[in-house]
Amino acid sequence: MKKIFRKVSMFLLMMSMPVSIALTGCCEESTTAPESKEKYNIIFITTDQEAYMPTFPQESNYAARERLRSLGTTFEKHYACSNVSTSSRSVMYTGRHVTETKMLDNTNLVFQPDMDPNIKTVGDMMTEAGYYAAYKGKWHISRHEDSLEEYGFKDWTEGNIYGSVWEGFHADSTIAARACDWLTTIGMERNQSGQPFFLAVNFINPHDIMYFCESEKTGSFGSATAPDAPVYKKKYPSVPVPASWNESLSKAGRPSAHFQYQKGWDLVTGESPNTEEEWRTFRDYYFNCIQDCDNQMNRLLDHIQELGLMENTIIVYTSDHGEMMGEHCMKGKGGNIYENNIHVPLIIYHPDYEGGRSCQSITSHLDLASTFVDMATDNASESNRIKAGVVGYSLMEAMQNTNAPMRNQEGALFVYDMISMMDDDPEVKPHPNGELELHVDLNNRGYLRGIVTQDFKFARYFSPLNFNTPTDLESLYENNDVELYAMGTSECDNMAHPQGNNPGLVEDYNNKLNCIISKEIGVDDGRETSNFIDGIEKYGK
């Protein structure tokens, strides 16, 4: 196919105005990208806590997201590999599961050390491929304040921002401005000297939803209502509150981890909504947080266009994890396999491929690093050398043919090893450095291994003191709380409960989970938990 630089540039300019886009299906013919004389720049845009939405609220004006959908390829079934921010981002920026990055909990908690800088990051890989790798915005994989160069990224200026109360509202405009300034100066200078760049732009919103609370029972981490700003005034009556907003957290068939997470989360972020109207207000604020972020994303896209970079730049957009938004009576993010929690947006704009396409195959965050390397290299041998040890698929296969099966056969693996969200009544004790440390019941089944396929989701919840790889139904149920949901359903009917329900299907998916763990992790025995400062057992109660 011919290059479409001029058509893309003119169309992007038109797309500066809000429009409604109808996405195409997944029946596109495969295309072969032309040989490029020079490497494309890559801009990686991330948001925080943004769940996948097949369509946007009719009241919204998500111009940047609509713009990328029309110009790029939308991956409709893309999943996070872990939660929450630190854990997921460590996967996104290394192509390795948290069992290898050992980023099991958030770095702003006293027991989680920084990621080992000897682990090769996307920044290291891009540099090895000849790129100038730079970083703007939220990092949250270490406590660094002034430099990320030991992690392979230059020109980071935002400091240790991780998403406090209203931080998206206050900081996203600065992140966008600094990214635009960087493109105008260093980015253009690099290109003029013949060097492509990789720029990561990491926005915070819609993470501000984490602290939204109208109750008097506020959280220990902070709570707030919406800022008094025009962008936060809009209502979204066209979007119904989920039918499961009042589903019991203790309902038969629900793992105990759901109750323990949600009640514990209320203690640190404030009491959850209790009525349908309260959930509506919560969701209105969430959609407005996305709008606020979208405005800054659109500002960045405008600047990319103004600099003439659309013709030689790939843009990748995703989020680290989702937000429950009232589904199943839950808010936030954590250890569960519900759609709103782990299903996230992914769009890739590439100058060599037509826009408005969609891919319906299963993909995951584990695939991002491999994809970036393939985008940045000229041949398979160079790519394989740079990404040695990375186990994800390259999404360039799906860019060439949107019908490519990707993970449809083996599924996408979700790994959750947080201790901070596994107890509804944690103990808080002072730490010698002046911070506070959480102590939880380590016998709770709050750790999780899950698999997502085209047809079903399956999960095992277990205690961090009892890692196990069950090979039969008896040991499965003895050591784990078990979930099985058909894809495309409300996920209110746990097909694996009670024990003896759908035994053949449960056994099949337990085996599938064991297989993908063996392939992508190897021995899954909990050895990574020794990375908690002073070891995991110190934080029991």
Protein language model features and the residues they cover:
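C-terminal motif of bacterial Sec signal peptides marking the signal peptidase cleavage site
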Residues: L23-G25
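Active-site-proximal N-terminal segment of extracellular/periplasmic enzymes that hydrolyze or transfer
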Residues: T32-E76, S82, A496-N501
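C-terminal, low-complexity/hydrophilic appendages and adjacent surface loops
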Residues: I141, K217, E339-N340, Y416-Q499
